[in-house]
């Protein structure tokens, strides 16, 4: 497992997702997925998170959302 992600809140338009690039309990940031325009934004990045690794991981999170496997529980993600 590369890291984890989980939905932390959801309303009609926005889904907020906590994620970590590690398997531990630390949170590397929060994403906001916009259902209207289809974009994902990093709204609270970790100061120690590597930007290029984060961008690659966001692609994995997006794919998990499209498959319907991302939930309110931690979802393990790997490349």
Model-identified regions with their sequence ranges:
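N-terminal acidic leader/helix
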Residues: 2-36
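Acidic, low-complexity intrinsically disordered segments
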Residues: 27-79
């Amino acid at each position: 497992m590369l890291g984890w992600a989980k939905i932390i809140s959801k309303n009609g338009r926005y889904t907020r997702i906590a994620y970590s690039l590690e398997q531990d309990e630390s949170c590397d940031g929060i994403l906001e997925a916009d259902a209207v325009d289809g974009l994902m934004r990093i709204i609270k990045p970790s100061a120690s998170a590597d930007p290029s690794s984060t961008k690659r991981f966001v692609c994995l999170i997006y794919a998990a959302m499209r498959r319907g496997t991302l939930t309110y529980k931690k979802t393990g993600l790997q490349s």
